[in-house]
Amino acid sequence: MSNKAWGGRFQSEPEAWVDAFNASINFDHLLIDEDIQGSIAHATMLAQQGILTEDESNTIIKGLQEIQQDYHDGKIEFTEALEDIHLNIEHELIERIGAVGGKLHTGRSRNDQVATDLHLYTKKAVKEIIHLIHTLQETIVKLADDHVDTIMPGYTHLQRAQPISFAHHVMTYFWMLERDKNRFEDALKRIDINPLGAAALSGTTHPIDRAKTQELLDFAALYENSLDAVSDRDFVVETLNDISLVMIHLSRFSEEIIFWSSDEAKFITLSDSFSTGSSIMPQKKNPDMAELIRGKTGRTTGHLMSMLMTLKGLPLAYNKDMQEDKEGLFDAVHTVTGSLRIFEGMLASLTVNTDRLNETVHQDFSNATELADYLVEKDVPFREAHAIVGQIVYWCIQHDCYLLDVPLEKYQEFSSSIDDTIYSYLKPENCLKRRKSYGSTGQESVRHQIKVAKDLL
């Protein structure tokens, strides 16, 4: 007979390399706290239901707590031969307290056990992610608050388009992150459900109380169907999806940080603490943290795709394929939490080069739309105004100047509707002041936007 926990019907042991292929302890050891938390709740409930005696339950719980402490103190090493965190803990428990440790698994399967662990882990991880998003949002709002009057070129197609407020630009990412935060908060409704007691797939004949373990583990609800309880990994997919979106938003912001900090732009200066150098080029200051966040976005999206493909053809209920749910989730959580911390520190410590931004916005044609609007206010049809401004811009390019440099006589050759008020009208700071529509880049609108954001925080 095999010595495995499931070895009664087997006449030989697997080869060591088969054990290694089958094992998940190399990564699911991260679930030790959740596994012991779930087991303590299960043991407590078994005693309450008279399935275990109080002494048996107390002995089991004390043993579990000692294993947990010894593991974190580095006194225990788990083994691949015992496959996973569940059987490693059970084996260690029986070694310590004897046969009574084997009673812990009464009315429970590894199927509902691992599902419980994963729900607990994901719930904790999502709450941490929400907190980190909130912290980053606070930093964005502070940065925006300091730069409502800082003007920069806004871009479309990476071409300068219209003058905007620096605050308005960075606040865009506040709202992206707000949607991310809302998605995670909504996902908690589907994460915060107790699968414990579903056993392998069909429930158990033992008189367990699933509501009690729900209470002890602080879950908001119970699975209504035991098959669904052990088969469901929607909450993992949803969490990976939400992580992927956060990372995509951080990646987009990182791309802008990289461009803004370049010698070509010089819009911002990154702190030395969040930059690195070159091993051969002494002058280099590289935005490696932003580049790494941009690069790591691919791996989180990859984990999402991997999980979807793992699930797409699985019959009910549990299948060993589902062991593949953990590494991607663990890595995605580690990646997004690290990225949020790094990005917040990078953003909090950067310097906005306001003079450079102001200089840049005075040396482009981003006020061309203003000239068209000016003509429209003079009762010139917009399409005609658009064509006139296009001709003026072409003339400026040919003569190496900008709209504020064009002599009035030349303006009036293009349109008699233009008078000397055009020069004040085209100043970038006045372009912003005239933007008064809700949600626009005008200072009044941006200050209102920041107030709304502060109220949300």
Curated annotation (Swiss-Prot):
List the EC numbers from the record.
4.3.2.1
Q: Which InterPro entries match?
A: Arg_succ_lyase_C, Argininosuccinate_lyase, Fumarase/histidase_N, Fumarate_lyase_CS, Fumarate_lyase_fam, Fumarate_lyase_N, L-Aspartase-like
Catalytic function, reaction form: 2-(N(omega)-L-arginino)succinate = fumarate + L-arginine
Which CDD domains did the record assign?
Answer: Argininosuccinate_lyase (cd01359)
Q: Name the domain of life this protein comes from.
A: Bacteria
Give its localization: Cytoplasm
Q: What class of enzyme is it?
A: lyase
Classify the main location: cytoplasm
Q: Per the UniProt entry, what are the Gene Ontology biological process annotations, in alphabetical order?
A: arginine biosynthetic process via ornithine; L-arginine biosynthetic process
Which pathway is this protein assigned to?
A: Amino-acid biosynthesis; L-arginine biosynthesis; L-arginine from L-ornithine and carbamoyl phosphate: step 3/3
One Gene Ontology cellular component: cytosol
State which residue ranges cross the membrane. Answer: none
Which Pfam families does the annotation name?
Answer: ASL_C2, Lyase_1
Instruction: Tell me its family.
Output: Belongs to the lyase 1 family. Argininosuccinate lyase subfamily.
Q: Please give the name of this protein.
A: Argininosuccinate lyase
Organism, scientific name:
Staphylococcus carnosus (strain TM300)
Originating gene: argH
